[in-house]
Amino acid sequence: MKRVFTSIAIMATMLFASAQNQLFFKHMFEKKTSDESIVGLGYRDDWGFYKSEDGRFILIDMAILSAVEPSAGIICCNITFKGEGCKNEEEAKTILESKVKPAIESLANDKKNKSAYVAASMDSTKLEIFAYTYNTEELKKEIEKSKLVGKIGQNMNISFKNDKNWNIYQTKLFPDQWNYQKIQNQRIIEDLQAKGDVNTKLHIVSHFISFPLDKRENADNLAAKAKTWKYYVDQVEEEEGVVKVVFSKKSKTDLESITTVTNEVMNLAKEFGGEYVEWSTRVMRD
């Protein structure tokens, strides 16, 4: 049995909205957005798919808030196609990723309308596309002259709403921390499988939780609690400005199993005031 190490960092504190839906604009790029564009130089999108608590299937660019600032001029555009629903998660994923996303990406290449397409969602009755813009007239013209009608569906309705602080994006579209983590879990699994991993085997999965330097006692208490849950504590030490706790245990790595584990560890981290950062394992081949 050959093993190859793989580790995917999950920067949860950077990329998911807080429970209080506060803004979390991070200075990841040299140029931030201005009134001339939605995203600045160096912006990299990051699309993720998930099922929300209210039953919608959502495909969303999870990185855009890392490149923007609040602006009084920003407006949210909602493009609705009634009667274009889906039967199940598999169908929604196929439609959103292979049909809707390419269509809106082709529109996004035209920067003159100062717009960015940020999400699309489906339920059993309708399909919706969301964009943010500084220029509603140009965006509406672009949408109406595009081939969205026909490619995606009929009965299109376009509406606009002022949204300076991106509240629609954050409260109605962005995944909560549990769904965000599940998206990351799926990505790790896909990465493992691409390297030949057999996920029916038990893997030694290591979890990394961070604490502020003044919370060393909390970190020690977390490590002690993890031991009672049959985790092996690999590390509790100060590193790169935080207290790093790493513990591990054998786990299955199919999506359902590993999501159960990460939910458990995230709750444990919260109990002691820590922040769940990532999990890692080794590729296991036959």
Locate predicted features:
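Bacterial Sec-dependent N-terminal signal peptides
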Residues: M1-Q22
